[in-house]
């Protein structure tokens, strides 16, 4: 369960949230344009999966802003070249539009996913859900945050305490 809280006092989060909020707005505008029947470009990648102008626009935006924020970290993007990224030990992993098929079928079940990978582990991640106007943010081994764009409010996940001495009854 998420409980209302203050904004995290974390410079990493405070710099990334506005960048992701702008990317989310770009993606939402692209989606609204597409659903309204506006001009929209959809192509096929080499693996026959679709890539839209929304994928590419959000990808360009985030690549630019991540390079400004953390110039020392390369970005492994779903829309990028694998051969250049094989040996990276630390990088951003980006999917600028996770759920392209849902987007194309006008289902609002798509996200922007951004993770910081160190070694072989995700140490930080943000998942933005444009149509819900929320973002989930977390560090490895810490409770995640939720940010509501529309209400401009922060929430932190709270683990409910259970009485371990009371057995859990399952079934009849």
Residue locations for each model-derived region?
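Charged/polar positions on well-ordered alpha helices
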Residues: 25-26, 101, 127, 140
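Glycine-rich active-site/cofactor-binding loop and its immediate structural neighborhood
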Residues: 90-131
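Well-ordered beta-strand positions enriched in small/hydrophobic/aromatic, beta-favoring residues
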Residues: 75, 92, 112, 170-171
């Amino acid at each position: 369960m998420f409980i209302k809280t203050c904004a995290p006092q974390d410079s990493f989060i405070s710099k990334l949230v506005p960048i992701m909020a702008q990317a989310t707005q770009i993606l939402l505008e692209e989606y609204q344009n597409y659903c309204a029947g506006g001009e929209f470009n959809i192509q096929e990648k080499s693996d026959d999966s679709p890539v839209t102008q929304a994928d590419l626009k959000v990808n360009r935006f985030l690549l630019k802003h991540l390079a400004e924020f953390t110039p020392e970290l390369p970005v492994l993007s779903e829309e990028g070249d694998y051969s250049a990224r094989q040996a990276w030990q630390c990088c951003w992993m980006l999917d600028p539009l996770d759920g392209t098929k849902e987007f194309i079928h006008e289902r609002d079940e798509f996200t922007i996913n951004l993770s910081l990978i160190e070694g072989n582990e995700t140490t930080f991640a943000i998942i933005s859900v444009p149509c819900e106007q929320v973002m989930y943010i977390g560090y490895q081994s810490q409770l995640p945050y939720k940010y509501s764009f529309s209400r401009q409010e922060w929430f932190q996940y709270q683990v409910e305490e259970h009485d371990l001495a009371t057995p859990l009854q399952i079934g009849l």
